[in-house]
Each structure stands twice: as C-alpha cells, then as structure tokens.
Design a protein with these regions (language model features):
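Flexible glycine-rich surface loops and low-complexity tracts that mediate binding to linear polymers
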Residues: 1-16
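Eukaryotic intrinsically disordered, low-complexity regulatory linkers and tails enriched in Ser/Thr/Pro
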Residues: 4-6, 105-107, 119-122, 128
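Preference for solvent-exposed, low-hydrophobicity sequence contexts
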Residues: 19-23
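N-terminal secretory/membrane-targeting helices
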Residues: 53, 67-68, 73, 86, ...
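Polybasic, proline/glycine-rich intrinsically disordered low-complexity segments
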Residues: 140-184
Length: 189
C-alpha cells in the first residue's frame, strides 16, 4: 500500500492555505467572540509582516500576496512558501527617508536553485524593484546576483527564475505497507 500526497498550497505557518481561519474579535462592550472563516476559491498565504506605515512597502506586500506566480496555479507568496522562505525582515521607512532607506523585504530560502538570502527593495527613482541574492560566506555575506529595474508585473517571473526549483510539482508517494508481494498463480481454464 502507498500513500499519495498531491501538491497543496500552504501558508507560512505550515498549514494548508485552504485551512479555515479562526479569529477572535470583541463586541462594542468588550465581550470576545470567535469566528471561523472559510474563503471559498481563495487560499491566501499572508506574509508574516505587520501592516506597514510606508505605502510602497504595503503595495509590495499586496503584490506578493495577490499576484499570480508564472505557473498561474499559485500566488507569488505560495512560491515563497514552497521555497522555504523564513526569517523575514523588512524596512518600513518614513516618507522622508524613502530614498536613503528604501522599503524592502528580506527572507532566507533553501531550494535546489539557490540557498541564501533574498532581498526585494523598492527603487523610488525608477518606481521599480531590485531583487538581490546574498549568500553567507563564512563570517561575511556576499552579493551573488542583483536584478535592477524589475517592474511589479515581472516580480513573479524573476523570483521563479532565481529561486523556484519546481519541486512543488512532484507528488509525494510513500510506502505504507512493505509486505512481500504475493506471487500470482495462473488459474487453470
């Protein structure tokens, strides 16, 4: 016997993306209540980043969460989950500091294509993004690759080319019962 596990989109917490969301809210008098929310046809993977004050960082987060990956089955954030994205950091500047400290999201991935740190930062001058790949080299961090002038609608393609190894397409098959196969015998006619 075997167990076949087809691909399922996941969230950053490891749960399936179509898992119901449980939210606790309060009424106007402070009484807490719980809501279990199922969003039909949607399987979001929200980035583990709080709501930013910088509009451009908010737009980057929205684009990563809402725009489809090049395969059209996943969103860009699902591609990041499949690449093992973790250890998220972000730069959320005030509007006056946006040039000297550009908004950015950085995370670590581990795939067959690339293992290291990925940074997506906003270039205010060109109204584009810059995607950088960094690798730990002993005590120092070295810049491995840099892609300038990445428009928002190119983010998925660039990230797929740099970090997506396609392993998500492989169906997981595991053997449950390793009994010796019975020998078949011919039945006389």
């Amino acid at each position: 016997k075997v167990h076949v596990q087809p691909y399922a989109r996941r969230r950053f917490d490891g749960l399936r993306a179509d898992t119901p969301e449980v939210i606790t809210e309060e009424t106007s008098d402070g009484t807490p209540y719980t809501i279990t929310r199922h969003i039909l046809g949607s399987a979001p993977a929200k980035l583990p980043i709080p709501t930013p004050q910088c509009m451009e960082l908010g737009q980057l987060i929205e684009q990563l969460e809402e725009m489809p990956a090049p395969d059209r089955f996943r969103r860009i954030t699902h591609m990041l989950v499949d690449a093992g994205a973790r250890d998220f950091t972000w730069v959320d500047p005030t509007p006056s500091k946006i040039i000297e400290t550009p908004p950015a999201i950085s995370f670590t991935v581990s795939t067959a294509k690339f293992e290291g740190r990925v940074t997506i930062l906003y270039d205010r001058g060109g109204d584009t993004y810059v995607v950088e790949l960094h690798r730990q080299n002993g005590e120092s961090v070295e810049l491995v690759d840099r892609h300038d002038e990445v428009y928002f609608d190119m983010l998925g393609e660039v990230l797929e080319r740099l970090i997506d190894d396609g392993r998500w397409r492989q169906i997981d098959v595991s053997i449950l019962d390793a009994k010796a196969a019975r020998k078949r015998q011919a039945v006389p006619a």
